[in-house]
Design a protein with these regions (language model features):
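Conserved acidic segment of CheY-like receiver
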Residues: 2-13, 18-22, 51
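Acidic, metal-coordinating helix/loop segments flanking the phosphotransfer/catalytic sites
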Residues: 34-50
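Conserved phosphotransfer cores of two-component systems
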Residues: 44-46, 72-78, 98
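Conserved phosphotransfer microenvironments
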Residues: 52-71
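Alpha4 helix (beta4-alpha4-beta5 surface) of REC/receiver domains from two-component response regulators
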Residues: 62-63, 87-104
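A short, hydrophobic beta-strand element within the central beta-sheet of small alpha/beta folds
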Residues: 78-89
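C-terminal output helix
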Residues: 108-118
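The C-terminal output helix
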Residues: 119-126
Length: 126
């Protein structure tokens, strides 16, 4: 069964890079949302294996942490693993304190460490 990932708040270029990585290494289907409301709706209607949230949403500059806390407080999505996509360690630490699993930064997108983190939720690399 194909793994499903929701990618929230990435610009077109970063969404493309993440999508390519997830398809190549995990044969994952990647859906995209641009806002808190879209993410909440998508998570309520699809069984995602992982949600990736940009630290700052590209469409409006809003905080990805707000998306994280909303998803984690919603019974429909509270159990879905969520990662914040950020190069900043303080953002990663804050995300984990708010219920996320350890994420990664875009600078480390192609690293073995990132693939290992993603593999914990998406299975073996393809």
């Amino acid at each position: 069964m194909k793994r499903k990932v929701l990618d929230v708040g990435q610009c077109n270029a970063d969404n493309y890079r993440i999508n390519e990585l997830l398809q190549k290494h995990f044969d994952a289907q990647v859906d995209r949302s641009h806002s808190l409301d879209e993410a909440i709706e998508a998570a309520a209607n699809t069984a995602y294996d992982l949600i990736l949230i940009n630290r700052l949403l590209d469409a409006d500059g809003s905080a990805g942490m707000d998306v994280l806390t909303s998803l984690k407080s919603n019974p429909a999505s509270a159990d879905i693993p969520v990662m914040i996509v950020s190069n900043y360690q303080d953002a990663q630490d804050q995300a984990v304190q708010n219920g996320a699993v350890v994420g990664f930064g875009k600078a480390a997108l192609d690293s073995a460490d990132t693939l290992e983190k993603l593999g914990e939720y998406l299975g073996e690399t393809a």
